[in-house]
């Protein structure tokens, strides 16, 4: 699916189904709105999927994997070889997201869109666009053509999920250095100084953190990415994993597939997707608010409320995995609980 085809296929989520799902919640024999954000999540799923009868199975978490040339600048504790190692663990079902997803009844699909390793990793879907990005202090991270190609690889994964019968998606990422690229992207899209949106990632020292902020600030100064053109921003200071996630969200919206975000990095890509095609927002669900400094900022920019505030910042799609059991519980209440009429009790009324 080309990016233009995906964007053209996106339709706004059904407002009629939103109203019907809200009405169903109001009929359930419990205090109005008492399941909080979980009620809104079920409403969003009904509207996005086009069905009042909410179905949450089967489901899969797609993890976009790619390496970032910016690691050369000392912005991480580990080398980029770790990306392929963790992706391989995902393929074997041994990574953190895999163990959590197994408990949540979800498949995990790791996708190589830009790992630096030359050899294919067994069990990892190969959609490689390039062998990592460039160091954005030396050159733009990607060409615009590479960025679009990665976005289209992401959109194709959404189509594949839909064709395989999945009704709910989750999103994750793996790429050493991608808290740097996502912070750079958010600095551009939110028009904020890098220091405000940059955290310590996987545990940088104060000196390392200061270096990270300096690198982002310098990369933005050199390339002047446009906050009005997310593809330009992705190309100049982003990453292949971020671009693929951006396309994945656009593809999910095009397919009518609700998709759960993880944390900061998936949120940055989601913001890029929404800036490209605003209707994508209606297909997104926030899982948790990341402990990274910009975690709350990106959700505010998206207008999404997370159900979980647990100080998480692991990545991989673990936040999406954590939300799924909560959605199951909420869907059970939505679907099976008696109505006020059925138990012969006067319904609650909304206070004006």
Can you say where each PLM-predicted feature lies in the sequence?
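N-terminal loops that bind phosphate or other acidic moieties
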Residues: 2-352
């Amino acid at each position: 699916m080309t990016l233009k085809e995906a964007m053209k296929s996106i339709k706004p989520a059904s407002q009629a189904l939103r109203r019907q799902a809200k009405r169903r919640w109001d009929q359930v024999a419990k205090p109005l709105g008492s399941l909080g954000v979980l009620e809104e999540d079920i409403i969003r799923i009904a509207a996005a999927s086009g069905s009042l009868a909410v179905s949450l199975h089967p489901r899969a978490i797609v993890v976009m994997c790619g390496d970032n040339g910016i690691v050369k600048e000392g912005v991480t504790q580990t080398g980029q070889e770790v990306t392929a190692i963790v992706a391989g663990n995902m393929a074997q079902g041994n990574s953190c997201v895999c163990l959590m997803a197994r408990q949540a009844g979800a498949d995990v699909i790791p996708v190589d869109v830009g790992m630096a390793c030359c050899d294919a990793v067994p069990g990892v879907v190969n959609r490689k666009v390039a062998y990592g990005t460039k160091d954005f202090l030396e050159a733009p991270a990607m060409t615009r053509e590479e960025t679009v190609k990665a976005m289209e690889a992401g959109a194709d994964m959404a189509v594949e999920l839909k064709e395989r019968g999945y009704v709910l998606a989750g999103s994750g990422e793996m790429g050493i250095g991608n808290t740097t690229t996502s912070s750079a992207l958010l600095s551009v899209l939110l028009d904020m100084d890098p220091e405000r949106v940059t955290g310590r990632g996987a545990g940088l020292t104060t000196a390392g953190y200061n270096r990270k902020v300096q690198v982002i600030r310098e990369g933005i100064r050199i390339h002047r990415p446009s906050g009005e053109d997310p593809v330009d921003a992705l190309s100049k200071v982003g990453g292949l994993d971020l671009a693929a996630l951006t396309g994945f969200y656009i593809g999910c919206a095009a397919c009518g597939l609700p998709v759960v975000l993880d944390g900061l990095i998936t949120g940055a890509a989601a913001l890029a997707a929404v800036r490209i095609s605003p209707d994508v927002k209606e297909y997104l669900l926030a899982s948790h608010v990341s402990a990274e400094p910009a975690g709350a900022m990106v959700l505010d920019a998206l207008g999404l409320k997370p159900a979980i505030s647990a100080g998480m910042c692991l990545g991989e799609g673990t936040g999406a995995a954590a939300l799924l059991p909560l959605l199951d519980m909420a869907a059970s209440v939505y679907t099976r609980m008696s109505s006020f009429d059925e138990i012969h009790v006067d319904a609650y009324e909304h206070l004006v």
